[in-house]
């Protein structure tokens, strides 16, 4: 396959712009712990104007052993891992039920940074799900009830009718309950890698695994 010229012209030289940072990522940055550094980088991405800096690309494996990716929002970060919420009956839910492992990548292109987290996936507790659910806007709660995620539908009009039906169903309810098919997943932080783009593709990669911090070749 030949390389397209217009794609080649999109090449970016890392490490030369102020936004990339003048200090090289090193293992001692992890002295504060990977959780603190991930939160710090997320905050810096937000301050730099990155939209939804908590967005992460989550990869799962389908029934044929093929990878599937999608972007979701990270909703918590602690020593146990990172969490997100979704429809358990969705394709990703079925994939995680069959193969409970996933990887997640936070791509902050504007800053020339990425963080990768991978490990075993478990459902968060019903209490954690209920707590997060209570903080969601009512419209988002109704949308979770209305959508049979990943299932085909005839038209957008049909989808909006499902939303209208759900809205009417809960019209007299002050607090919309958590759907039985909806909740959170926790990706255990078995491996966490911090990546910083540098000049000439000699990037910085620092990995945390089993408590050990080590530099990887780019």
From Swiss-Prot:
Molecular functions per Gene Ontology: FMN binding; pyridoxamine phosphate oxidase activity
Regions that span the bilayer: none
Cystine pairs: none
Cofactor: FMN
Record: residues binding substrate: 11-14, 75, 132, 136, 140, 201-203
Pathway listed: Cofactor metabolism; pyridoxal 5'-phosphate salvage; pyridoxal 5'-phosphate from pyridoxamine 5'-phosphate: step 1/1; Cofactor metabolism; pyridoxal 5'-phosphate salvage; pyridoxal 5'-phosphate from pyridoxine 5'-phosphate: step 1/1
Keywords: Flavoprotein, FMN, Oxidoreductase, Pyridoxine biosynthesis
GO-annotated biological processes: pyridoxine biosynthetic process
Catalytic activity: pyridoxamine 5'-phosphate + O2 + H2O = pyridoxal 5'-phosphate + H2O2 + NH4(+); pyridoxine 5'-phosphate + O2 = pyridoxal 5'-phosphate + H2O2
Binding site for FMN: 70-75, 85-86, 92, 114, 149-150, 195, 205
Function: Catalyzes the oxidation of either pyridoxine 5'-phosphate (PNP) or pyridoxamine 5'-phosphate (PMP) into pyridoxal 5'-phosphate (PLP).
Assembly notes: Homodimer.
Family under the similarity heading: Belongs to the pyridoxamine 5'-phosphate oxidase family.
Entry-linked NCBIfam families: pdxH, PRK05679.1
Name of the protein: Pyridoxine/pyridoxamine 5'-phosphate oxidase
Organism of origin: Mycolicibacterium gilvum (strain PYR-GCK)
């Amino acid at each position: 396959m030949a390389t397209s010229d217009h794609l080649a012209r999109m090449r970016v030289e890392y490490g030369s712009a102020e936004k990339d940072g003048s200090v090289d990522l090193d293992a001692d940055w992890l002295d504060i712990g990977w959780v603190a550094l991930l939160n710090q980088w997320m905050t810096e991405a937000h301050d730099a104007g990155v939209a939804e800096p908590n967005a992460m690309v989550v990869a799962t494996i389908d029934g044929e052993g093929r990878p599937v990716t999608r972007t979701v929002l990270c909703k918590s970060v602690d020593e146990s891992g990172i969490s997100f919420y979704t429809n358990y009956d969705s394709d990703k839910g079925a994939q995680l039920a069959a193969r409970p492992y996933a990887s997640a990548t936070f791509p902050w292109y504007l800053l020339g940074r990425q963080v990768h987290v991978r490990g075993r996936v478990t459902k968060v507790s019903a209490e954690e799900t209920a707590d997060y659910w209570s903080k969601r806007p009512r419209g988002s709660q109704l949308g979770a009830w209305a959508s049979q995620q990943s299932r085909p539908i005839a038209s957008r009009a049909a989808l909006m009718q499902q939303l209208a039906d759900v809205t009417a169903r809960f019209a007299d309810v002050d607090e919309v309950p958590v759907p039985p098919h909806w909740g959170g997943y926790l990706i255990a932080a078995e491996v966490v890698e911090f990546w910083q783009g540098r000049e000439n593709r000699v990037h910085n990669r620092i990995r945390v695994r089993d408590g050990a911090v080590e530099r990887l070749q780019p």
